[in-house]
């Protein structure tokens, strides 16, 4: 049965699917090359590690402790790469590599190599790469690289190479990349590169000052693609003009980085390509300079001349940079072929073509990245960091705001030689990535405060050749990363204090060729200036204090071409420049005046000649002043053996602070002395009071007045109890001038109050009692004067028991209350009892002992002191002074206070007795002072009631812990009938 048409179509589809699947599988499955399919039977060398990579045999023998190449005994028939870095090979001997003749790359880095003998590389005819970096090689001789005819890449950076002989590379005809950075090469010999055709040359970090055209630059030619000359101390004088002219003839992208001038000082830090030839060599014209140096005249044809492009490219220390050019035009930019970074360079066989062939793919630049460039400007993109160099020089811009569209990630912006007059804060809103801004040779006269606040990464700022007159701190706000600042060739007349304090990283400041006459205080405070150019201004002298003393890190300072006035004002400045290194001062510091010192260097003039008005010689042995000493002011200090008085001027801040400190400490000491003196005088004025005198003064609650003695008559003696007379008188009066002599006692004021005066009925009772007493007593001769009054006074208690019973009961209650109040107080009442001879009456006294009958109080006797009355129980316990002194007899019951009508009363004589005690009127008191005794009216000693119960005793003990108010106790102890 024949298959149907549908089946045939189905089978055909299946065949096509199988066929297409087979083809697709064949395309996707890699077919190994013949050489890869071959088994590599090359042995490895123990202890090394071997691998196959990119069809090459890699032998890793790094860090194995080899000291000689002869220790590697294995032979490899295939091309291989040998890694021998970080071993201990101090020397390469002749024919060391004969058995390694198939090596295409040898790495001998970091081996501390010190010498390479002649013929050490014999046998390495196919070697293309040789690494000698990080060793201790100091010379390349003419025969050092013999046997390396195929060498294309030589890396010898980070050695100590000081000398290269002119024929060192004569056999390296295929050499293309030469890396010699970070060595000590001071110069390159003539015809060194005559036999080579270098495309990459790295001479960074050496000691080159100049490169000559003849025999050096003319052999490099147009084959050079990348040249690095940074970090060399270039001497920008007439000799370097040939290098500048040669750089103008090579592709502007060939030079990576800047050629920064080191000397002379006025060109320090500037790019060589930014300096005119007439400035480098002002005595000759450009054509004369080129002719004298043998530089061929440049063609006037634009199509044959290399374009002159931006003056500066991206500066890189560890990486080379390739760049492409983009012009703001309608034409599509043509890519410039540039090599890749040679450190580490790519590895490839047949890497470099012939001299007339373009570079091959491994070194070609990738297609240009689309960039944004302002209209009318030229932009260069650096591939390594995608940074942009924007060249807008001589384009007629009037304002920075005209730069549209704004470029992205701009690193360098050149706006020199335009017509810009003012700079505003909004001008740099999209330039935060800038590290160089060139605004030189414009017409700038105004810079708004904070104009550069959007440039935090700026390292170099050029404002030279403008019309700026004043510098203020606000102009530099936001420039905390700035290192180089150029203000030369302006019309600056004023610099405000601390103008540069907002730039802590400032290393270089050029203020030369301005109109400055002085510098303000703290002009350089907060900076770390290493180089300062003050050349060609109008300085007569410079202050040290507050200005030059802040230049602690100064390396170079140019003070030339200023009209220095060599008088006394210049002495501190002279001392300062003598203390710093002589190398730091650039050029001469010549006097302009006075006439006798004209054209003489300040450093060579003696101080006596410079300032004849010096007053005295400073003490010998003082150390010289340092440049940072704060005491260097407008007069010489210990830096010289002389001192003088300055003619005038403001007082320096350091002297003012020191003076204020001296005044402050002096005031403190004077105040302390006055205080001590016043205390001492007060102690002398205060009287010395003994304890007995203090006892006499404590009369605050003494019972010193009684209504019965309003007359203040003399006291008398009596008999009662023991029948012994007892007299009492005040103690010795206070000394003259005593405080109590003019201060009345407060209790006297209270006794004058009418509420304490006796009532009329009491006065009637007193008068009747006096009459009755005089009838009962004997004749007047039986009693001493005043005793009658005392007896009459006691008779008031001698009424009928019926009449006085209630009064007596009230009296006992009041006595108990008063005793409790006195016992709880720490204030004691002192009563002094004086014993007098019986036949000596107490003249004018007020004390007495009365015995009498009648009533419950008839048996009490009373003692009076200064008008107060104290009642004693019968039996003479307290009745006489003799009883107080007789310690052999049994002690009587404790005395109690009977009744006190008032204190002091209203009797003027009693007041006078208190305020002016008549102690000095009784000489017998002085003789019998030893007989005086003091009764202390206090709880537990003199006046406790026998009837007080135990509970009352505990209460009294508790009250002893408090100190009642004086007036409160006084009120409690003042009673009336």
UniProtKB/Swiss-Prot annotation:
TM ranges: 655-675
LRRCT domain span: 232-283, 562-613
Pfam families attached to this UniProt entry: LRR_8 (PF13855)
Disordered: annotated span: 325-360, 708-735, 761-790
Extracellular side: 29-654
Residues annotated as glycosylated: 68, 596
Membrane topology recorded in Swiss-Prot or TrEMBL: Single-pass type I membrane protein
Keywords: Glycoprotein, Leucine-rich repeat, Membrane, Repeat, Signal, Transmembrane, Transmembrane helix
SUPFAM superfamilies tied to this protein: L domain-like
Tissue specificity note: Expressed in the occipital lobe of the cerebral cortex of the brain. Expressed at higher levels in some astrocytic brain tumors such as astrocytomas, oligodendrogliomas, glioblastomas, gangliogliomas and primitive neuroectodermal tumors.
LRR repeats: 78-99, 102-123, 126-147, 150-171, 174-195, 197-218, 409-430, 433-454, 457-478, 481-502, 505-526, 528-549
GO biological process, one term: axonogenesis
One cellular-component annotation, GO: postsynaptic density membrane
Chief place of localization: membrane
Domain (LRRNT): residue spans on this chain: 364-406
PANTHER family the UniProt entry points to: SLIT AND NTRK-LIKE PROTEIN 3, SLIT AND NTRK-LIKE PROTEIN 4-RELATED
Family designation: Belongs to the SLITRK family.
UniProt function note: Suppresses neurite outgrowth.
Protein name: SLIT and NTRK-like protein 3
């Amino acid at each position: 049965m024949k298959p149907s048409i549908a089946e045939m179509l189905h089978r055909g589809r299946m065949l096509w699917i199988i066929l297409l699947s087979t083809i697709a599988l064949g395309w996707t499955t890699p077919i190994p090359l013949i050489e890869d399919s071959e088994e590599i039977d090359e042995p490895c060398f123990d202890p090394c590690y071997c691998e196959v990579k990119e069809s090459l045999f890699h032998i890793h023998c790094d860090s194995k402790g080899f000291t000689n190449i002869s220790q590697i005994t294995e032979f490899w028939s295939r091309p291989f790469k040998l890694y021998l870095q970080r071993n201990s090979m101090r020397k390469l001997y002749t024919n060391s590599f004969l058995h390694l003749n198939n090596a295409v790359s040898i790495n001998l880095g970091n081996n501390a190599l010190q010498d390479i003998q002649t013929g050490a590389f014999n046998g390495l005819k196919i070697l293309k790469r040789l690494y000698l970096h990080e060793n201790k090689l100091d010379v390349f001789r003419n025969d050092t690289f013999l046997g390396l005819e195929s060498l294309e890449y030589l890396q010898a950076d980070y050695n100590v190479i000081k000398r290269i002989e002119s024929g060192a590379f004569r056999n390296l005809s295929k050499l293309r990349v030469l890396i010699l950075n970070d060595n000590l090469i001071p110069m390159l010999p003539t015809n060194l590169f005559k036999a080579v055709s270098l495309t990459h040359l790295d001479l960074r970090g050496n000691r080159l000052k100049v490169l000559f055209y003849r025999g050096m630059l003319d052999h490099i030619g147009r084959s050079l693609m990348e040249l690095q000359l940074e970090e060399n101390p270039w001497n920008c004088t007439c000799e370097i003009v040939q290098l500048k002219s040669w750089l103008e003839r090579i592709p502007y992208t060939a030079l990576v980085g800047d050629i920064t001038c080191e000397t002379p000082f006025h060109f320090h830090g500037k790019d060589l390509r930014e300096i005119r030839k007439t400035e480098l060599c002002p005595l000759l014209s450009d054509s004369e300079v080129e002719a004298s140096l043998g530089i061929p005249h440049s063609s006037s044809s634009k199509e044959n001349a290399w374009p002159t492009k931006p003056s500066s490219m991206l500066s890189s220390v560890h990486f080379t940079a390739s760049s492409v050019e983009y012009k703001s035009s309608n034409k599509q930019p043509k890519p410039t072929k540039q090599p890749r970074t040679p450190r580490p360079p790519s590895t490839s066989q047949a890497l470099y073509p012939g001299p007339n062939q373009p570079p091959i793919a491994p070194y070609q630049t990738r297609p240009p990245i689309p960039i944004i460039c302002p209209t009318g400007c030229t932009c260069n993109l650096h591939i390594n960091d995608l940074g942009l160099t924007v060249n807008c020089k001589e384009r007629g811009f009037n304002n920075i705001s005209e730069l549209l569209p704004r470029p992205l990630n701009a690193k360098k912006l050149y706006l020199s030689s335009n017509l810009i007059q003012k700079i505003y804060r909004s001008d740099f809103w999209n330039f935060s990535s800038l590290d160089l801004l060139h605004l030189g040779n414009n017409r700038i006269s105004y810079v708004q405060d904070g104009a550069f606040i959007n440039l935090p990464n700026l390292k170099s700022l050029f404002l030279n050749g403008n019309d700026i007159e004043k510098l203020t701190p606000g102009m530099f706000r936001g420039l905390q990363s700035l290192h180089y600042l150029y203000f030369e060739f302006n019309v600056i007349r004023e610099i405000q204090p601390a103008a540069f304090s907002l730039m802590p990283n400032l290393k270089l400041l050029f203020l030369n060729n301005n109109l400055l006459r002085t510098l303000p205080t703290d002009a350089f405070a907060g900076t770390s200036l290493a180089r300062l150019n003050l050349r060609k201004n109008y300085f007569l002298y410079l202050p040290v204090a507050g200005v030059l003393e802040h230049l602690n890190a100064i390396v170079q300072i140019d003070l030339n071409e200023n009209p220095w006035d060599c008088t006394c004002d210049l002495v501190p400045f002279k001392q300062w420049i003598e203390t710093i290194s002589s190398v730091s001062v650039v050029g001469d510091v010549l006097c302009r005046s006075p006439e006798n010192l004209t054209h003489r260097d300040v450093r060579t003039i003696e101080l006596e000649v410079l300032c004849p008005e010096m007053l005295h010689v400073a003490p010998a042995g003082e150390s010289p002043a340092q440049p940072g000493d704060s005491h260097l002011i407008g007069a010489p200090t210990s830096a010289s053996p002389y001192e003088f008085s300055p003619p005038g001027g403001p007082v320096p801040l350091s002297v003012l602070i020191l003076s204020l400190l001296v005044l402050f400490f002096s005031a403190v000491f004077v105040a302390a002395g006055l205080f001590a003196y016043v205390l001492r005088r007060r102690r002398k004025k205060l009287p010395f009071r003994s304890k007995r005198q203090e006892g006499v003064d404590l009369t605050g609650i003494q019972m010193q007045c009684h209504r019965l003695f309003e007359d203040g008559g003399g006291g008398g003696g009596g008999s009662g109890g023991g029948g012994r007379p007892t007299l009492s008188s005040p103690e010795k009066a206070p000394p003259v001038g005593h405080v109590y002599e003019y201060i009345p006692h407060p209790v006297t004021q209270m006794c004058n109050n009418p509420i304490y005066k006796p009532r009329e009925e009491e006065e009637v009772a007193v008068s009747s009692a006096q009459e009755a007493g005089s009838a009962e007593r004997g004749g007047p001769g039986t009693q001493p004067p005043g005793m009658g009054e005392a007896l009459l006074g006691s008779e008031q208690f001698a009424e009928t028991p019926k009449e006085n019973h209630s009064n007596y009961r009230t009296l006992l209650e009041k006595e108990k209350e008063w005793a409790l109040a006195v016992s709880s107080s720490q204030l004691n009442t002192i009563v002094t009892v004086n014993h007098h001879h019986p036949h000596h009456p107490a003249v004018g006294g007020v004390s007495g002992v009365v015995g009498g009958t009648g009533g419950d109080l008839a048996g009490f006797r009373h003692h009076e002191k200064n008008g107060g009355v104290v009642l004693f129980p019968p039996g003479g316990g307290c009745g006489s002074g003799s009883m107080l002194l007789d310690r052999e007899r049994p002690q009587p019951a404790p005395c109690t206070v009977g009744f006190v009508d008032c204190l002091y009363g209203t009797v003027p004589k009693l007041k006078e007795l208190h305020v002016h005690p008549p102690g000095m009127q009784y000489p017998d008191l002085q003789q019998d002072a030893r007989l005086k005794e003091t009764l202390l009216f206090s709880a537990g000693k003199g006046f406790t009631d026998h009837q007080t119960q135990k509970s009352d005793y505990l209460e009294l003990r508790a009250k002893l812990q408090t100190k009642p108010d004086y007036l409160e106790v006084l009120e409690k102890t003042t009673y009336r009938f």
